[in-house]
């Protein structure tokens, strides 16, 4: 896939000035879109069912709440080497777990302790021994299994993305500020309808939005800025600077959309997002991943 030839790049060339179209194309990032597997297509990932776990790895539990639900698994070897801009393992499986509670018994928004307890990423290297399907603990109903294949796509930054704000926003504003927002710089499209129609068409063609790498697709504000708050909470200058620095290195590992086929509904058609620092991903330190979720 050549990002410069993607529908998102073409939308920039059509609705932006030549200078801004080039900036836009440089902001696009490759992502690995996960869609339902069809006959003859490779199995890349799956939702729900019984996860494949080594015998010596315990099912993740949130102390005081209970076992986490298995959400998804992704085969790192199925991503064409070097095609994503994040340092994924070249082999092995990544498994994602989430405590699917409600109210006060749920993973709380931007609460570091809740996120650490109620979400988990487990990496199973290809060399792991005694790997077998693991039944969910008694009383935990697994989500239905959905088999997924994958394809490389271009992904676009949202209006609150720090890089987009830096490229097209007010130079006097701080791109990393929580409330910074900028419109896409359309020309000859006064209300932006043509450009947004192109974005909407592309997104509709790639729904549900299960994705490895690339830009996150938010439901309600910047995913990366929210996740940074979960790592460095607080309103003081030290916390704000720590979040600003983190945004330079924080990347989305995976997003899992609501999906009726797997009986997954995160709030009101929401999404789950796992993020991680590039250096932690390269070091395979998945216990340092963070998380947020959004809903309409």
For the regions a language model picked out, list residue spans one by one.
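Short glycine/proline-enriched turns and hinge-like loops at secondary-structure junctions
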Residues: 87, 265-268
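C-terminal structured domains
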Residues: 267-296
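Hydrophobic, ordered structural segments
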Residues: 80-164, 280
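Hydrophobic, aromatic-enriched interface-forming segments
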Residues: 143-205
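Short, isolated positions within intrinsically disordered regulatory regions of eukaryotic proteins
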Residues: 28, 63-66, 100, 270, ...
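An N-terminus-focused feature that recognizes amino-terminal "leader" regions
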Residues: 1-93, 175, 183-261, 286-296
């Amino acid at each position: 896939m050549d990002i410069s030839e993607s529908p998102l790049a073409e939308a920039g060339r059509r609705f932006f000035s030549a200078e801004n179209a080039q900036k836009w194309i440089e902001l696009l990032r490759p992502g690995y879109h996960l869609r339902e597997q069809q006959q003859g297509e490779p199995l890349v990932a799956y939702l729900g069912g019984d996860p494949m776990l080594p015998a010596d790895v315990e099912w993740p539990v949130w102390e005081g709440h209970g076992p986490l639900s298995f959400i998804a698994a992704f085969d790192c070897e199925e991503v064409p080497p070097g095609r994503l801009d994040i340092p994924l393992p070249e082999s092995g499986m990544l498994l994602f777990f989430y405590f699917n509670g409600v109210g006060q018994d749920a993973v709380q928004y931007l609460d570091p302790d809740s996120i650490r307890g109620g979400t988990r990423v487990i990496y199973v290297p290809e060399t792991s021994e005694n790997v077998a399907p693991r039944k969910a603990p008694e009383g935990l109903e697994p989500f239905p299994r959905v088999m997924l294949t994958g394809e490389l796509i271009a992904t676009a930054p949202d209006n609150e993305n720090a890089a987009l704000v830096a490229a097209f926003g007010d130079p006097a504003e701080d791109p990393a500020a929580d409330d910074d927002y900028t419109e896409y710089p359309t020309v000859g499209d006064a209300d932006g309808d043509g450009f947004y129609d192109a974005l909407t068409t592309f997104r509709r063609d790639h729904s549900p939005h299960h994705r490895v790498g690339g830009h996150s697709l938010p439901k309600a504000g910047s995913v990366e800025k929210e996740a940074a708050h979960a790592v460095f909470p607080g309103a003081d200058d030290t916390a704000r600077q720590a979040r600003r620095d983190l945004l330079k290195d924080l990347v989305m590992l995976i997003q899992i959309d609501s999906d009726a086929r797997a009986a997954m509904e995160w709030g009101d058609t929401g999404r789950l997002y796992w993020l991680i620092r590039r250096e932690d991903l390269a070091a395979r330190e998945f216990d340092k991943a963070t998380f947020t979720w959004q809903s309409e």
